[in-house]
Amino acid sequence: MSKSTIDLKQLSIQSSFPNSQKRYVTGSRSDIRVPFREISQHPTVTDSGEAENEPILVYDSSGPYTDESYEVNIEKGLPAIRKSWILERGDCEKYEGRDVRPEDNGFTKDDDPRAAREVFPRTSSHKPLRAKKGANVTQMHYAKKGIVTPEMEFVAIRENVSPEFVRDELARGRAILPSNINHPESEPMIIGRNFHVKINANIGNSAVSSSIAEEVEKMTWATRWGADTIMDLSTGKNIHTTREWIIRNSPVPVGTVPIYQALEKVNGVAEDLTWEVYRDTLIEQAEQGVDYFTIHAGVLLRYIPLTAKRVTGIVSRGGSIMAQWCLYHHKENFLYTHFEEICEIMKTYDIAFSLGDGLRPGSIADANDEAQFAELETLGELTKIAWEHDVQVMVEGPGHVPMHQIKENMDKQLDICQEAPFYTLGPLTTDIAPGYDHITSAIGAAMIGWYGTAMLCYVTPKEHLGLPNKDDVREGVITYKIAAHAADLAKGHPGAQKRDDALSKARFEFRWRDQFNLSLDPERAMEFHDETLPAEGAKTAHFCSMCGPKFCSMRISQDIRTYAKEQGLDTEEAIEKGLEEKADEFKQAGGNLYR
């Protein structure tokens, strides 16, 4: 067994958060077990004794990796929690599937010395699933027929809404539930503007960096910190093998950009791409269990000249690949001309479209231009076609957009794409901060999330500079969890403020450990506190190093409340009386300003 296989066995799978426990809420059947993270709190200490603080239940996308009772074995993969739900519907079948070929991993022969040896250990009897002839297995199809699936009930419990509300949003196309029937390990989640704003984390190897072990660990790391979906954007060798390990161990939906792998199969020469190579790649990834595909079918031949005067041209990798193909052959984009056939594949496995914005602006100078909005019109057209097949759709958006132009993007998308979920990369609100683009983009992400975007694609500090490592992934996920939560608060999402209120109360009561534990990144919060006040006693002190004991505003506020209670006054009366006492004290001292 190779060294890299040993590395895979020894991956650093993360434990649970401090003072937290995994809790499961059971649905109408015993196999619907919806995970949450329960954060325990310490009691409030008062003069009259202790008052209990209720634990806070929060949304949890980390899968069983943070369940201390679960024994991790990534060579086995996660439990197939949806398998029985899928099979009992009776509308799918097992079949032989396609054989894995050397070109699937970017090689010309099986014995290439660069080929990964750690093929995921599937049993010899494993066969992929597909819809039976004439059947449609999409969650949208079931929703339109009035069927509430176990997946829909699972999501309803997660979101604290009714199953019927979930079904209705899916039927209308205002939400998607990405759930390939060949990814039964995934815990159902929903993407739509009437639900929690979700975030996606991009991972994937490249031709110059990263390994399978690192990408699997990055996936578990990203979901630990709160990624709701993962996109595997691998562009180097061993793409198929890397993706298999990720999907089998991913508790969240996995998306891809199939054109990247198709390009590898033709040795990186865009003009050599064909519909046949691309179609084969779609089926390959569908059989593995990819839940949504980014497909750049809106990059039409007539739109390409509209980018000629841009500052940054076409910045989407997929968009530039298709533009090059169109110009070389002077033909229409084959993803557009074969879109109906793609829909047939999507509904055979229940894969959602993520209609790619191949002409998104790559600089604020290019924001909201003719090319961007021309493509959006085509994406609206394609959305309607997909819905005719009952295929789930979300639409991708920019990009680089200054703050005053963000709302126009959201309004146009809702109108043109008939309220299909919007999935945006940021947008970045300024171009002057390489190394800090997780911040420049989070500003735009919070705004567009408030206006109605359903999912935000994270940006890490390495954006435009290099491939993110584990620390960058953590930074990007946390930054985008902040943006998504801020949007939930602004939209008035039920229950969104409960965690904020609990943390604020803990802060006012100087329950330092509860402050840390209720935060999005408990480790970082405690680390910063302990840089200046590391002693254990500082965890109960009524001040921090920012103001010190004499100038802590919250301690002073508490003193005012204590004074009011002792004097039998309310807080405003206590302040007034205190001011009067100080005035009398000033007069009795002679009324001199300086003494």
Curated annotation (Swiss-Prot):
Pathway given in the UniProt record: Cofactor biosynthesis; thiamine diphosphate biosynthesis
Name assigned to this protein: Phosphomethylpyrimidine synthase
Biological role stated in the UniProt entry: Catalyzes the synthesis of the hydroxymethylpyrimidine phosphate (HMP-P) moiety of thiamine from aminoimidazole ribotide (AIR) in a radical S-adenosyl-L-methionine (SAM)-dependent reaction.
A UniProt-annotated Pfam family: ThiC_Rad_SAM
Keyword field contains Acetylation: no
One annotated GO molecular function: carbon-carbon lyase activity
Gene label: thiC
Residues involved in Zn(2+) binding: 400, 464
Biased composition (Basic and acidic residues): 97-120
Region annotation (Disordered) ranges: 97-134
Cofactor(s) needed for function: [4Fe-4S] cluster
Cofactor binding note: Binds 1 [4Fe-4S] cluster per subunit. The cluster is coordinated with 3 cysteines and an exchangeable S-adenosyl-L-methionine.
Superkingdom of this protein's organism: Bacteria
